[in-house]
A protein has these predicted regions:
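N-terminal glycine-rich flavin-associated loop
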Residues: 39, 63-95, 117-160, 171, ...
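Activity-critical C-terminal alpha-helical subdomain
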Residues: 411, 511-560
Length: 661
């Protein structure tokens, strides 16, 4: 199916208008009736949603950004997505595609049309005895791996958010994770995509005649892709920059390594879409080559005297074939010591400057595992550890180690003061520069007053995450965060690193893409975007943004609401298990709406309060199953079901009191 290409001379949506006003909610949708009629000519009336509660519910993803869409479209098939693109182009509206909403850089929220592609795209098909899987964008990584487990295989990408992260986001953010590195990430394990371009053209890049079809349906685009490839490959400096940045984890900007790694416009396009964060096309289906599941593992948490000691050991540990090397700084160890089932190696001492490495080896046979463990244990014996460390194949010991590593984010986020927002950032540098980079980050935390910040991450890949909390209200706090960001950018780029390793450029790093790649490659990215999306309808402000303050615009403000839900980080882990997720609201959305209500009430916007209250009665209260399944999935231990029960009791008490008056 194709539609006429939009007139490239038509004005692009101005995505900067929203920088000043989207924190307000506003009772009425800003969409004109003509736009709604156009959308509903193909999409069912109930699936084009403009009520305030629907729009506010989708204003947040897992990041620290907040954008209220003008309408939410629940797409049921590929035709409806293509139609939404056409209507958006005809009426100068932006389109944000959303599935799991676990994005950490702001790429899953927008102020135009938000198209939910989770509900209608949940099919998957296993082929070749599990070696290949075709999967639609609304399926979670955990669901895919559960199907593949029957064949003792799994996806290469292993994001920590696998329970909620969906394939649409996995492709669009080039997801990797703790074990896959750059060898088994999305870019490396993908073998085909079915794409809907902004023009409405549908291309299956896995088809034998994909190049011919792309030339037939989009001749200018096909030729432009090859022209950009020649431009890149003929410039030795550009080739060197691309090779350096993509030698380690990198989700900054577009995947220009596609121009070096592939021939033919369809395959180049396919891999450019990987990591494009919904700015180039809709991924209607992805085909992955899967990898074997390791049957056996041995694990330890080794404590070093300081970060330098831990990071200095990395090259030798990588050389032993370690599957996982996870770094935790002193602040992380201090947090970990409070865990109920903390690893013994991090207990029994006062934390000063120590650092820890979670080291794990994988194998298919017991003999192979024993050999790897022997090599690893011998190396640890030669290193200067703060205290002795031993490997274990016991499930309880492995669970304890991983609870420590994976529980850090939740523990710090849960302990943050009410009303603050948690920011989880990630960067990557060459492994040999990791020690100095971590030391530099700690200095920046101290100089900017982020005393509670912690550093952890995938040390094997030179990829570290850091978590800090702040209350983004007032000029002083925004200036502090802006100053920290500028200094952090200088630190990472001076180490020849990448400003985003896993989480995507999003809105958080869009103003800094030019600084990482230089003017020439930034222009290549601009021309690529213009060639595929001439009207700029897909996710404007994400990846490319000339506004130097874009990263501090529309920052999420989390007012104090109710004690039971104040610690919510809006990660979305609760959503896949919620019985009402396809009927009304999810636990995350119930909390997002309560926060919007509290903010409106604080501003004296009682029309918004009344509008939200009216619809929350059914959407938020009556349709909640109150089975507390969300509690089991929530990393910070929020029981939204219990919270809704309290609201129901209060409503009941109010009715009883009015009867007896």
């Amino acid at each position: 199916m194709t539609t006429a290409s939009p007139d490239a001379s038509h004005s692009q949506p101005d995505h900067h208008d929203h920088h000043e006003h989207t924190h307000g909610t506003g009772v009425h949708s800003a969409l004109e009736s003509q736009v709604l009629e156009s959308l509903r000519a193909v999409i069912a009336d109930d699936d084009v949603r403009t009520r305030l509660i629907d729009r506010v519910a989708y204003a947040s993803d897992a990041s620290h950004y907040y954008n209220v869409p003008k309408a939410v479209i629940v797409a049921t098939d590929i035709t409806e997505v293509a139609h939404a693109f056409k209507v958006a182009a005809d009426h100068d509206l932006s389109v944000t595609l959303r599935s799991g909403g676990t994005s950490l850089s702001g790429q899953a929220s927008g102020d135009g049309l938000l198209v939910d592609v989770r509900r209608g795209f949940r099919n998957m098909s296993v082929q070749d005895n599990g070696r290949i899987i075709r999967v639609q964008p609304g399926v979670t990584v955990a669901q895919v791996n559960a199907r593949l487990a029957l064949y003792n295989r799994k996806l290469g990408p292993d994001p920590a958010s696998e329970s909620a992260a969906t394939i649409g986001g996995v492709v669009n953010n080039n997801s990797s994770g703790m074990a896959c590195g750059t060898e088994f990430n999305t870019y490396q394990t993908l073998s085909g995509l079915t794409l809907v371009l902004p023009s409405g053209t549908i291309i299956d890049t896995s088809a034998d005649d994909a190049d011919a079809k792309l030339y037939a349906l989009e001749p200018k685009l096909a030729e432009k892709l090859l022209q950009l490839q020649r431009r890149v490959k003929d410039n030795p400096e550009s080739v060197g920059i691309i090779q350096r940045h993509f030698a380690i984890k990198n989700t900054m900007g577009y995947g220009l390594n596609s121009f070096l790694d592939f021939e033919g416009p369809a395959k180049i396009l396919e891999h450019l879409v990987v990591g494009s964060e919904g700015t180039l096309a809709f991924v209607a289906e992805a085909i992955f080559e899967t990898i074997p599941v390791a049957k056996l593992a041995t694990t330890t948490v080794a404590v070093f005297a300081d970060l330098h000691g831990a990071t200095s050991a990395l090259p030798d540990l990588v050389g032993t074939g370690a599957a996982t090397l996870e770094l935790m700084d002193a602040a992380s160890i201090k947090v970990g010591q409070s865990f109920d089932d903390a690893p013994q190696s991090i207990l029994g001492f006062d934390v000063d400057k120590q650092a820890a490495l979670l080291i794990e080896y994988h194998a298919q046979t017991a003999d192979e595992l024993a050999e790897r463990e022997h090599i690893g244990q011998k190396l640890l014996g030669d290193l200067e550890l703060f205290k002795p460390s031993a490997f274990s194949t016991q499930t309880a010991d492995r669970n304890s180690a991983w609870q420590f590593r994976k529980g850090l984010y939740a523990k710090v986020a849960k302990a943050r003061p009410s009303g603050t927002t948690a920011l989880l950032e990630d960067v990557a540098v060459p492994v040999e520069r990791l020690a100095n980079t971590c030391a530099g980050l700690q200095e920046l935390f101290d100089s900017n007053g982020y005393e509670e910040a912690v550093i952890f991450g995938h040390a094997k890949d030179g990829n570290i995450h850091f978590l800090l909390t702040d209350r983004f209200e007032g000029e002083d706090n925004l200036k502090r965060y802006n100053s920290f960001t500028d200094d952090m950018v200088d630190l990472i780029l001076s180490a020849e690193g990448n400003l985003k390793a896993e989480h995507g450029t999003g809105r958080a790093m869009a103003p800094f893409v030019r600084r990482q790649y230089g003017d020439e490659l930034y222009e290549v990215m601009q021309e690529l975007k213009q060639a595929i999306d001439p009207r700029g309808i897909l996710n404007p402000g994400v990846i490319l943004d000339e506004d130097p303050a874009a990263h501090i615009s529309n920052v999420k403000l989390n007012p104090t609401v109710e004690e039971e839900i104040d610690t919510c980080v809006e990660c979305g882990y609760c959503e896949p298990v919620c019985p009402s997720k396809d009927l009304t609201l999810t636990p995350r959305q119930r909390i997002v709406v309560r926060r919007a209500r509290a903010k409106a009430e604080g501003q004296g916007d009682y029309a918004t309060v009344a509008e939200l209250d009216k619809d929350y009665e059914y959407m938020g209260k009556q349709t909640c199953a109150v089975d507390s399944m969300c509690l089991r999935a929530c990393p910070v231990g929020i029981d939204t079901g219990k919270f809704i029960k309290r609201l129901r009791r209060e409503d009941s008490n109010t009715v009883e009191q009015s009867v007896w008056k």
